């Protein structure tokens, strides 16, 4: 792995919003860090229950949440993730009974479908509408349980504006600050260190193939259910805000 910004960190917690985000945004990075001898952990905030489904994958009586979670478990295994958790469920629960943070959904703000914003029908228990202190505490509980010494999540814009991504930036940053841990955001802005994880393209592609309900892999590209194409991310920018 070239351009390693993580220094002495040996146990890195990736905080993501939905099943598939860990593989789409950071699959190659997770594989590279694991290959370097570090242990990587994935905390996923929602079950991705409002995501689109490829035609023919799930019948009318199918359990979408169960499918999403099975895909998530398989993808994490393929990446060599040392531990995974769902926000609101121990070990990612600071106090009180376990709870579910629901997928907020989103709405595209442009015709090219590159910039997202809040959905008008976000449920009352949506992650993006949750108490920020409660979420930060749950993230901190998970970080402590896994012995994390660094946290990674989205930048303040959530990458492409998804409200769950935007919300997690603030909550994860607060959790890292409270624990005194280095906080890294995924970024292509000036000052970001670009980690070249291209040697781990195959691992990233393998993890992405776990998500057959949502996307398909064609060579070094992934194709979303809506037809949008993007290169598999093997050069990943991170920075300390």
Predicted features and spans:
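A structural signal for well-ordered alpha-helical scaffolds and beta->alpha junctions
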Residues: 65-69, 132, 136, 165, ...
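Short helix/strand-bridging catalytic loops that position acidic/His residues to coordinate divalent metals
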Residues: 57-60, 157, 191-192
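Active-site metal-binding loops of divalent metal-dependent hydrolases
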Residues: 45-48, 156, 188
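Active-site rim/loop-helix segments in enzyme catalytic domains that contact anionic ligands
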Residues: 1-146, 178
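The feature marks non-catalytic terminal segments
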Residues: 2-5, 95-105, 125, 146, ...
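Structural signal for conserved beta-strand scaffold positions within catalytic alpha/beta enzyme cores
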Residues: 44, 85-88, 153, 185, ...
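Histidine-centered active-site/metal-ligand motif
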Residues: 16-18, 162-165, 211
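Active-site adenylate/phosphate-handling loop in enzymes that bind or generate adenylated species
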Residues: 132-179
